[in-house]
């Protein structure tokens, strides 16, 4: 949705998150998935200014090649980052991880991107096509919008008859971390009560 934001004249703002990674993708207790931490997000114009100043923002292992080079970026850079997340989510392997930040950046810029099927021969071909397209080094060959990526993913799920029932993710979260969530809620309620009591003195 952020990619589609427009200004008061109806022109696209060109928002780029610049820090899409597993750390910034949260699942709410109701099952909704949220992208958070827009602290380093910029419009295209401001991204160019930051790039000229030589500033690299974001987690190195989830940068696009153009971002790692310090070049101007647009929303397609975010889609490369989503491709990394999708690759790691479906292979349980890190894609770019060097011994140092510099080594990681070098891997992002020039290392060969392996096919998911090289780790799992049974990896679905259509899902691999989607992942590989998101991870195209040339932005022009990559998905151009998040809507295109979403369309292909939904089509894949439909073709494979993979259905997540409404409330299914929320139910899974409740089973896995429900007790921990409730503990935190109780702790917050207790802290708020203590704060309110202190303010009333």
Go through the PLM ranges and name each one.
Residues 19:
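Conserved catalytic-loop position in the HRD/HxD motif
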Residues 23-28, 36, 59-199:
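C-terminal lobe helix-coil module of Hanks-type protein kinase domains
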Residues 15, 33, 74:
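Hydrophobic "anchor" residues on beta-strands that sit immediately upstream
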Residues 9-10, 27-31:
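Activation-loop N-terminal segment of eukaryotic-like protein kinases
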Residues 1-15:
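Protein kinase catalytic-loop region centered on the HRD/HxD motif
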Residues 33, 46-57:
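Regulatory activation segment
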């Amino acid at each position: 949705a952020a990619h589609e934001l427009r200004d008061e004249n109806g022109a696209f703002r060109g928002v780029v998150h610049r820090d899409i990674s597993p750390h910034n993708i949260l699942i709410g207790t109701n099952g909704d998935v949220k992208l958070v931490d827009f602290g380093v997000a910029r419009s295209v114009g401001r991204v160019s200014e930051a790039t000229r100043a030589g500033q690299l923002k974001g987690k190195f292992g989830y940068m696009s090649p153009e971002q790692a080079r310090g070049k101007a970026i647009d929303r397609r850079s975010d889609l490369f980052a989503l491709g990394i997340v999708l690759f790691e989510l479906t292979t349980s392997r890190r894609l770019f991880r060097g011994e140092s930040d510099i080594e990681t950046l070098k891997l992002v810029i020039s290392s060969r991107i392996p096919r998911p099927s090289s780790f799992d021969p049974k990896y679905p071909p259509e899902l691999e096509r989607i992942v590989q397209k998101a991870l195209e080094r040339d932005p022009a060959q990559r998905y151009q919008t998040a809507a295109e990526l979403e369309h292909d993913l939904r089509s894949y799920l439909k073709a494979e008859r993979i259905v997540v029932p409404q409330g299914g993710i929320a139910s899974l979260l409740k089973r896995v971390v429900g007790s921990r969530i409730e503990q935190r809620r109780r702790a917050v309620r207790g802290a708020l009560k203590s704060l309110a009591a202190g303010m009333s003195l």
